[in-house]
């Protein structure tokens, strides 16, 4: 008995057929699709995160040149409000949308009607065809992701009519600048100008353009559809050079978000393999930022349109980034990391707080048999210091999301006497953490840079300053001067002070020193709550003392002033106790840079006519979050200098051994076993004179001698 023939394949693209390798691929049925949202239209479609309200489609059979029935369906949106642009172009109202079907039911009707039309026309598999990429990439896929809908496979490949038109007519403008009207005009097609049904004219015109392309001299074939990736592919970044036009920076991410959450935020756009790199701060914790690498520049441009779209209740800022920034975060994969990340489709978890004595068997026992690690011991990666000491961190691989969820339930479970934290992680985070501990530089701990000497601020309690709050983070001094308008003429020289946060980024605050109290009050009354770059800015009077406190790291709020962290008792000028008279190894000009206890000899005997060293007074304090001064003619000082001891504090002027400020080098983190030769080898190429060996001064433990190898040195 002969078995019955197999059933015909369902409508949709056949994954077994690779059209890119077939020299003469079988033409597929085309479904011309048009859609609109309740917000922006045209090139900005989907940029405002509004819901889909309309779908119009029609089937075209390329072989017989026949077309099916034109269908139009309204979609009920969660937010019924229509933008003025949409209301004018579509003629729809909130009442008509309220009676429409939901998106999931409309998609079911779409699949049923398209399958019926394709069968009537004698076609087989079909592919969507749209005007541009916004409808699928920026509207349908993101909205389906937000509403937890599963789109049919047919929505993961499509033809961009603009690109297909540009292939046959390359002399026209770029594909990105084409529209349905310009394509019809270039082909000399007559369109129905009386058609006023929104979306119908666009679909009819697109069908006419497609039929004209099919009947062209070369018989244009729609053979290479655009592909939308269904899932994000994890893995190490192996590229040494990354195109600057393919990278964006996402800011404001929830700290617990993973690379899969970031990929879901950019649903519909093709992210390169291993292209999500979550950024870490100096402590190795996530700072709410990520660098994302896309497959091409067009995907990156579409990603920039998702600026201030939402991930849950948080809006995410999206900015341009460079390939160099991405390589710094995601690159530099070692052999150990590459081997660990070589397994694809694995979920990575990070374990933190492990006992230093814990081994692979202890971690596997902690996780338990209900959530096995992929590969057992091979699926664990322990983070260690360069000398082999454990850091208490480890990474584990799990085969699926269910096993990872089971492992996350062990969060803050006990291993020995310590509780263990478990978090979702990414391949880029594995690389960053391992790179942080992979190698130790010759001088591992660098001293903080010396800041320029701040411009002296006049004392007084008069409210002759104004404070600007809520500035855009991109605001410059020129923007502030333009914002103040006529009041900018009353600013004192060097009177504009921008405030940075602890990460060195603008905090949105600034202080302006005015010529008088009256001018400051007038500027505050005139400019309070004026708008700068779509943000209103608060302008309130304040005193110079309040400004100084904030610039030094304190805070100013309605509850009053809080002192900055640097305002400690040791920072005020001490009593002038004299030291033992001895040859000065470190001149008085540089003693203000180091703690006085580190510079004192072991014995202290009162003596006269010796230099006195103390911390700089309030007039020369380091303004830790001060950034820039408003330049006045000729220019503000820009050179970096040292804080010097006031001349009145010197009983006598010793002979300085420093010919210039740059001759002072401080070495921190020197091994206890380091000797004189080890220190001199560091400065081998800097021509340290033999008679200058005595200028190696131990710091930090006065009772030790040079031969006892102190922890810290000052080299002169």
Curated annotation (Swiss-Prot):
Q: Name one GO biological process term.
A: regulation of RNA splicing
The subcellular localization recorded is:
Nucleus
Q: Which UniProt keywords apply?
A: mRNA processing, mRNA splicing, Nucleus, Phosphoprotein, Repeat, RNA-binding
Q: Which CDD domains match?
A: RRM3_ESRP1_ESRP2 (cd12742)
Superkingdom: Eukaryota
- Spans of biased composition, class Pro residues? 1-14
The family database entries (InterPro entries) matched by this protein are listed as: ESRP (IPR050666), Nucleotide-bd_a/b_plait_sf (IPR012677), RBD_domain_sf (IPR035979), RNaseH-like_sf (IPR012337), RNaseH_sf (IPR036397), RRM_dom (IPR000504)
- What GO cellular-component annotations does this UniProt entry give? nucleoplasm; nucleus; ribonucleoprotein complex
Residue ranges of domain RRM in the record: 246-342, 347-427, 464-544
Phosphoserine (modified residue): where?
Answer: 83, 562
Q: What is its main location?
A: nucleus
Q: List every stretch annotated Disordered.
A: 1-24
* Gene3D superfamilies linked to this entry: 3.30.70.330, Ribonuclease H-like superfamily/Ribonuclease H (3.30.420.10)
Q: How does this chain assemble?
A: Interacts with RBPMS.
Q: What does this protein do?
A: mRNA splicing factor that regulates the formation of epithelial cell-specific isoforms. Specifically regulates the expression of FGFR2-IIIb, an epithelial cell-specific isoform of FGFR2. Also regulates the splicing of CD44, CTNND1, ENAH, 3 transcripts that undergo changes in splicing during the epithelial-to-mesenchymal transition (EMT). Acts by directly binding specific sequences in mRNAs. Binds the GU-rich sequence motifs in the ISE/ISS-3, a cis-element regulatory region present in the mRNA of FGFR2.
* Descriptive protein name: Epithelial splicing regulatory protein 2
């Amino acid at each position: 008995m002969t078995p019955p023939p197999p059933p015909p394949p369902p409508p949709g693209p056949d994954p077994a057929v690779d059209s890119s390798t077939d020299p003469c691929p079988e033409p597929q049925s085309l479904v011309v699709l048009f859609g609109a949202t309740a917000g922006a239209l045209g090139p900005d479609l989907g940029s405002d995160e509004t819901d889909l309200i309309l779908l119009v489609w029609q089937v075209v059979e390329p072989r017989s040149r026949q077309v099916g029935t034109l269908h139009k369906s309204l979609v009920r949106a969660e937010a019924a409000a229509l933008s003025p642009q949409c209301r004018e172009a579509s003629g729809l109202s909130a009442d008509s949308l309220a009676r429409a079907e939901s998106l999931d039911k409309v998609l079911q009707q779409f699949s049923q009607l398209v399958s019926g039309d394709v069968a009537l026309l004698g076609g087989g598999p079909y592919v969507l065809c749209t005007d541009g990429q916004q409808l699928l990439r920026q509207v349908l896929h993101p909205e389906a992701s937000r509403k937890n809908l599963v789109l049919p496979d047919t929505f993961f490949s499509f033809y961009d009519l603009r690109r297909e038109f540009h292939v046959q007519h390359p002399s026209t403008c770029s594909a990105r600048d084409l529209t349905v009207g310009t394509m019809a005009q270039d082909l000399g097609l007559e369109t129905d100008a009386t058609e006023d049904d929104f979306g119908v004219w666009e679909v009819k015109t697109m069908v006419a353009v497609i039929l004209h392309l099919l009947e062209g001299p070369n018989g244009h074939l729609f053979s290479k559809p655009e592909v939308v990736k269904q899932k994000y592919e994890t893995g190490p970044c192996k590229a040494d050079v990354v195109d600057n036009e393919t990278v964006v920076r996402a800011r404001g991410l929830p700290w617990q978000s993973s690379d899969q959450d970031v990929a879901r935020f950019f649903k519909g756009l093709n992210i390169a393999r291993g292209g999500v790199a979550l950024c870490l701060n100096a402590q190795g914790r996530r700072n709410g930022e990520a660098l994302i690498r896309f497959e091409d520049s067009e995907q990156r441009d579409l990603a920039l349109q998702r600026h201030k779209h939402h991930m849950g209740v948080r809006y995410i800022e999206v900015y341009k980034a460079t390939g160099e920034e991405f390589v710094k975060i995601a690159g530099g994969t070692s052999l150990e990391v590459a081997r660990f990340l070589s397994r694809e489709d694995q979920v990575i978890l990070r374990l933190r707080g492990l006992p230093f004595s814990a081994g692979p068997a202890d971690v596997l026992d902690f996780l338990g048999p209900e959530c096995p690690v992929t590969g057992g011991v091979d699926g664990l990666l322990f983070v260690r210091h360069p000398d082999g000491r454990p850091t208490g961190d480890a990474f584990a691989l799990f085969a699926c999301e269910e096993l990872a969820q089971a492992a996350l339930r062990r969060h803050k479970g006990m291993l020995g006497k310590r509780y263990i934290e478990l978090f979702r992680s990414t391949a880029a985070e594995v690389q960053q953490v391992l790179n942080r501990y992979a190698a130790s530089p010759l001088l591992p701990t660098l001293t903080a840079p010396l800041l320029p000497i701040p411009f002296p601020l006049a004392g007084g309690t008069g409210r002759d300053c104004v404070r600007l709050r809520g500035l855009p983070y991109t605001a410059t001094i020129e923007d502030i001067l333009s914002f103040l308008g006529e009041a900018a003429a009353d600013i004192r020289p060097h009177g504009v002070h921008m405030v940075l946060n602890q990460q060195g980024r603008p905090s949105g605050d600034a202080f302006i020193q005015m010529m008088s109290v009256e001018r400051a009050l007038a500027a505050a009354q005139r400019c309070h709550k004026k708008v700068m770059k779509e943000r209103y800015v608060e302008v309130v009077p304040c005193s110079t003392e309040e400004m100084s406190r904030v610039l030094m790291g304190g805070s100013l709020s309605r509850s009053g002033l809080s002192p900055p962290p640097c305002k400690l008792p040791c920072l005020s000028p001490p009593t002038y106790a004299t030291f033992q008279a001895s040859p000065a190894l470190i001149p008085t000009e540089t003693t203000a840079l180091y703690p006085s206890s580190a510079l004192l000899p072991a014995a202290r005997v009162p003596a006269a006519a010796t230099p006195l060293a103390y911390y700089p007074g309030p007039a020369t304090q380091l303004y830790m979050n001060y950034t820039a001064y408003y330049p006045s003619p000729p220019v503000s000082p820009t050179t970096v200098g040292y804080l010097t001891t006031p001349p009145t504090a010197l009983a006598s002027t010793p002979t300085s051994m420093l010919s210039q400020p740059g001759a002072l080098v401080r070495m921190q983190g020197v091994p206890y076993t380091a000797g004189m030769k080890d220190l001199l080898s560091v400065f081998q190429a800097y021509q340290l004179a033999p008679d200058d060996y005595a200028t190696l001064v131990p710091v930090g433990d006065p009772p030790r001698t040079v031969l006892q190898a102190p922890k810290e040195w000052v080299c002169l």
